[in-house]
């Protein structure tokens, strides 16, 4: 039975480990332009996985749900995505005693605002500074959640106003912002955070959103003294977001480090195959076979090819071959070919092709560094392919 948001007594002991579902950066309504022709299919896959969240909450018997910003990709989502969010949150409220949300830098509070039609029983933090905690009594005991809607114009340093309540139970801070030492974009309009600020909050868990890679508490402090966690993006928004994506299941109790587990969203993840040596391959089709054999079931390949080859790799052809097997594939070519036997043979020819090969080799050898060398080699390959030379 769902319990009242009001605490049933001034002091209520924790009855069991509290389980919280923590998500952020779903970006409903994103274009997924990086996925090219697969963009529409990708968008539908995200919506399908998002609709499954109530079942995830039910399966894990969570006591609360936290949404740490950027639920939407813009402050004015289209009606379909707004309706999807309303329905999912309505169903989540049938499973968990409470759902808490903060806006992010992509979906800030405007008028009418992206969260205007969210069910009233969900709590959206709309003040620009953290105030008193919103408290709910759960089957695991009292939960106190602190949050705010960051607005630099109103309060550039909202965490300076944070005050933890002196109350029994689990205390959680819900924050959308970028930790300064994270490998994160340097600009933007997100709240900037520091380890020191997070460590002084005195709460049992800090549910973070904005940074798109899963970062468990151990990445903030090995001893558990900073109980912060980025759940990462719900699903990869572009081809750079490789690896597992989803939501975090948190088990937390007062005065002990939280235990977190990343639950895959169910949207096909991007699998990075970095520096894949294809020097033993004899042609593009063999490269396709080698890559395909390394892709995990249900994943989409993002591969960087490397090695010294005896043929000029055609990354567009390799990518097309992979796209015939997977809904999406991205290929980056970093192979070396300029000092191969084939190119030496071409440079010995007494024709336009030979002249081009010799000129290209001279420019490659005169490059000032490896980056410039690679650029000049790839330019030579493209020029040779344009002349029908493989």
Language-model segments: residues:
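Short, positively charged and aromatic/hydrophobic N-terminal segments
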Residues: 3, 13-14
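Leucine-biased recognition of intrinsically disordered, low-complexity hydrophobic segments
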Residues: 5-7
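N-terminal active-site segment of His-dependent metallophosphoesterases
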Residues: 14-83, 167, 372-390
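Accessory, non-catalytic peripheral segments of nucleic-acid enzymes
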Residues: 16, 254-390
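Conserved beta-strand elements of the Class I
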Residues: 21, 144-146, 248
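His/Asp/Glu-rich metal-coordinating catalytic cores
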Residues: 35, 64, 75-229, 233-238, ...
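Glycine-rich, Lys/Arg-enriched anion-binding loops that position phosphate/diphosphate groups
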Residues: 213, 218, 224-227, 231-281, ...
